């Protein structure tokens, strides 16, 4: 650390700011005496606490350390967050497209039945219930559960055929099979 022109160390002055604690005696006579760390009387005492002196350089050093720490943490979070987003976005987009296709097919099935002139309200209710069930199950929170991904955040391979290179998402496959 370099000194500035008006620094107290160049002027051979003592630091201008000093904090002191009050001395409290615990009873009169024999006993513990003053509370340790209180050094009102004697600055030359070898048992005195140096932390009671506020040295301006310490404040500067402390603020630089803190700023460096905060900057480092922020930069690390930003870089790892961006890298995770870049790696996971394509896979998430594919899953989102599949979910959208499933929900669109269910809506189209409802509309096709209405166009064909089916007056059976039970079928409409069944299709509506099925669509609402799909919407609930295919919610983003359910689709992106950790159980569907390996430790590298790639979709797990099919349990039936581990030799294929195809990814497998149990929930999406369930609804794709229901569409057939």
Curated annotation (Swiss-Prot):
Biased composition (Acidic residues): 39-49
This protein's UniProt keywords: Cytoplasm, Nucleus
Location(s), subcellular: Cytoplasm; Nucleus
Transmembrane segments: none
Any one GO cellular component localisation term in the record: nucleus
GO BP annotation list: protein maturation
Disulfide bond annotation, renumbered to this chain: none
Region spans: deca-GX3 motif: 68-108
InterPro entries xrefs: Essential_protein_Yae1_N, Yae1-like
Region (Disordered): 1-53, 112-131
Compositionally biased tracts (Polar residues): 1-15
Subunit structure of this chain's protein: May form a complex with LTO1.
Function per UniProt: The complex LTO1:YAE1 may function as a target specific adapter that probably recruits apo-RPLI1 to the cytosolic iron-sulfur protein assembly (CIA) complex machinery. May be required for biogenesis of the large ribosomal subunit and initiation of translation.
Family of this protein: Belongs to the YAE1 family.
Protein name: Protein YAE1
Chain's gene name: YAE1
């Amino acid at each position: 650390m370099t000194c500035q022109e008006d620094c107290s160390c160049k002027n051979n002055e003592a630091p201008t700011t000093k904090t002191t604690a009050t001395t409290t005696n615990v009873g009169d006579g024999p006993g513990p005496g003053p509370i340790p760390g209180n050094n009102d009387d004697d600055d030359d005492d070898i048992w005195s606490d140096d932390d009671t002196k506020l040295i301006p350089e310490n404040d500067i050093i402390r603020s630089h350390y803190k700023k460096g720490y905060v900057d480092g943490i922020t930069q690390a979070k930003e870089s790892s967050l961006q890298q995770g987003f870049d790696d996971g976005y394509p896979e998430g987009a594919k899953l989102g497209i599949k979910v959208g296709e499933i929900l669109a097919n269910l809506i189209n099935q409802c509309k096709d039945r209405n166009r064909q002139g089916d007056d059976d309200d039970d079928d409409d209710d069944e299709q509506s219930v099925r669509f609402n069930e799909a919407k609930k199950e295919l919610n983003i929170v359910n689709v992106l559960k950790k159980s569907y991904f390996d430790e590298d955040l790639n979709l797990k391979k099919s349990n039936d055929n581990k030799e294929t290179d195809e990814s497998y998402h149990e929930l999406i496959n369930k609804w794709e099979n229901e569409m057939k």
